[in-house]
Amino acid sequence: MSLLTEVETPTRNGWECKCSGSSDPLVIAASIIGILHLILWILDRLFFKFIYRRLKYGLKGGPSTEGVPESMREEYRQEQQNAVDVDDGHFVNIELE
C-alpha cells in the first residue's frame, strides 16, 4: 500500500486528507517546519539585497578602502557620481501653452 493511498483518498467532493486534525507529533513538527520555511523564504525574497550585503560586508557600508590612496578614492567617487548624473541633452523640453 502506497503512502498516497493511505493519506489521500478520492471522494465524491474531491480529494480529502485523512491526516487532518491528527495529533501525531511528527505531523505537527512537519507542519511547523513547513510554515517556518515558507515565512523565511518570503522574507528572503523581500530583503535579499539587504541580507546578503550585510552578510558580505558586515556592519560596514561597502568594500573597504583601506590602503587605497586618497587620489584613487576621489577618482572612484567622481566616476560613481558621473554615472548617476543625468545628461540633460537626452531629454526634450516640451512647453505647453
UniProtKB/Swiss-Prot annotation:
GO terms for molecular function: monoatomic ion channel activity; proton transmembrane transporter activity. The modification Phosphoserine is found at residue 64. Residues 1-22 are virion surface. It comes from the Viruses. It is a single-pass type III membrane protein. The keyword Ion transport applies. It is found in: Virion membrane; Host apical cell membrane. Its main location: virion. Keywords: Disulfide bond, Host cell membrane, Host membrane, Host-virus interaction, Hydrogen ion transport, Inhibition of host autophagy by virus, Ion channel, Ion transport, Lipoprotein, Membrane, Palmitate, Phosphoprotein, Signal-anchor, Transmembrane, Transmembrane helix, Transport, Viral ion channel, Virion. GO terms for biological process: protein complex oligomerization; symbiont genome entry into host cell via pore formation in plasma membrane; symbiont-mediated suppression of host autophagy. InterPro entries: Flu_M2 (IPR002089). Residues 44-97 are intravirion. The M2 protein from most influenza A strains is inhibited by amantadine and rimantadine, resulting in viral uncoating incapacity. Emergence of amantadine-resistant variants is usually rapid. The keyword Transmembrane helix applies. The record marks 37 as: Essential for channel activity, possibly by being protonated during channel activation, and by forming the channel gate and the selective filter. The record marks 41 as: Seems to be involved in pH gating. The chain crosses the membrane at residues 23-43. Residues 61-80 are annotated as: Disordered. When the channel is activated, one or more imidazole moieties of His-37 probably become bi-protonated. Homotetramer; composed of two disulfide-linked dimers held together by non-covalent interactions. May interact with matrix protein 1. Belongs to the influenza viruses matrix protein M2 family. Cytoplasmic tail plays an important role in virion assembly and morphogenesis. Forms a proton-selective ion channel that is necessary for the efficient release of the viral genome during virus entry. After attaching to the cell surface, the virion enters the cell by endocytosis. Acidification of the endosome triggers M2 ion channel activity. This is Matrix protein 2. The lineage of its organism: Viruses, Riboviria, Orthornavirae, Negarnaviricota, Polyploviricotina.
